[in-house]
Amino acid sequence: MYFQKKETFFMPLTKDTLTFECETGNYHTFCPISCVAWLYQKIEDSFFLVVGTKTCGYFLQNALGVMIFAEPRYAMAELEEGDISAQLNDYEELKRLCSQIKKDRNPSVIVWIGTCTTEIIKMDLEGMAPRLEAEIDIPIVVARANGLDYAFTQGEDTVLAAMAHRCPDINSVTQNINIEDNGRERLLSFLPSKEKASNERKNESTHPPLVLFGSLPSNVTSQLTLELKKQNIDVSGWLPSQRYAELPSVGEGVYVCGVNPFLSRTATTLMRRRKCKLIGAPFPIGPDGTRAWIEKICSVFGIQPIGLEEREKQIWNSLQDYLNLVRGKSVFFMGDNLLEISLARFLIRCGMIVYEIGIPYMDKRYQAAELALLEKTCQEMNVSLPRIVEKPDNYNQVQRMRELQPDLAITGMAHANPLEARGISTKWSVEFTFAQIHGFTNARDILELVTRPLRRNLSLEQLGWTGLVKRNKLTA
């Protein structure tokens, strides 16, 4: 990698409207099967079986760690030459593995993760799963989270879209509940207190059912659920749930809302296949995004939000020490995990200048509310609107960074060291995927990640240790 000064690569920021461009760059990202890393921890009674080659196994070992003593709830079904040449019976091999999994771990659900190889050899995982499920009496969910996706975070999207088909239907569940309640009321009709309690329980929620989708740590889901509870909004359930048996009921009349910008496939499945109504809201990343997310849900249910402005102001006041560090600094997003729009919007609100937002894939319909909030934020902060580049070409991005000289580049791991060697501070975008960045209180964690290289540079400058890099960065 080297720098070559070309003025044609520099594009100025726009002032009036968002500018969308599409380049033909390659996708430099993790494989989507890495979603196993956080999903197997979220769904506590699950087991993930990745059907792939040695390369997939090496990747999982490096990405997740060997974990010899932890006995993790995931494994590799390694394809061999006999599988690829159709000399072995795929069904019998998978049956043997799943039977062993049932004997050793007895999970409530087994998730088959398809890979590039299963796509190439046309392995019929969807056809084998129902037969094997009936035979071993354990639900089997098939998700093709292969490397043909745009970003590694879309692996979660694929798994959640597959699980959305397994959610119970709200109408059948409601009918069963009504039958049980009627029978209980007739049985206990001589107890007025019980009858009163039953009526109160029916009148608890005055709005339609609300299901939130997106895999977040349990403490974060509790925080977001509590924030909505303060507005008299009850969350019927989360997709995914901590246990497979606790999947939320969906169907006609159920409202769904996402918490991550890379879940467009799940949103489409819930709308088209399960007939749910999608609430198109900004994502709850940063105090501004969390407030807008809650306000949008409140507006759909006809509820007047209470105390959100004071809550957001309180959080911003607690972040002043970080805001003083980032205010006036510039940042360049190379694009990696589809969180770029939300993070850029939050950093602009913090006072940073965003030159460019590179993103591997852009679903403008699913992220429409987030894009509108980004535009509104830029207008309120009186800053130019950043360029949004879909499928960015990394060579062209390097040239633009050479011209713009940002204070920070948020990039994939592959480009971090070369950019650091040329004097551009970097932050791995994958760290934002695994950090707790949702909700009001976790905004500090975002700024902790963003300011770490800035604070490091400040310390090095005070020690006088940055002269060598600064002197040689343009000649490298």
Swiss-Prot record:
It catalyses: chlorophyllide a + oxidized 2[4Fe-4S]-[ferredoxin] + 2 ADP + 2 phosphate = protochlorophyllide a + reduced 2[4Fe-4S]-[ferredoxin] + 2 ATP + 2 H2O. This is Light-independent protochlorophyllide reductase subunit N. GO terms for biological process: light-independent chlorophyll biosynthetic process; photosynthesis, dark reaction. HAMAP family: ChlN_BchN (MF_00352). The keyword Transport does not apply. Keywords: 4Fe-4S, ATP-binding, Chlorophyll biosynthesis, Chloroplast, Iron, Iron-sulfur, Metal-binding, Nucleotide-binding, Oxidoreductase, Photosynthesis, Plastid. Coiled coil: none annotated. It comes from Staurastrum punctulatum. Its cofactor is [4Fe-4S] cluster. It is found in: Plastid, Chloroplast.
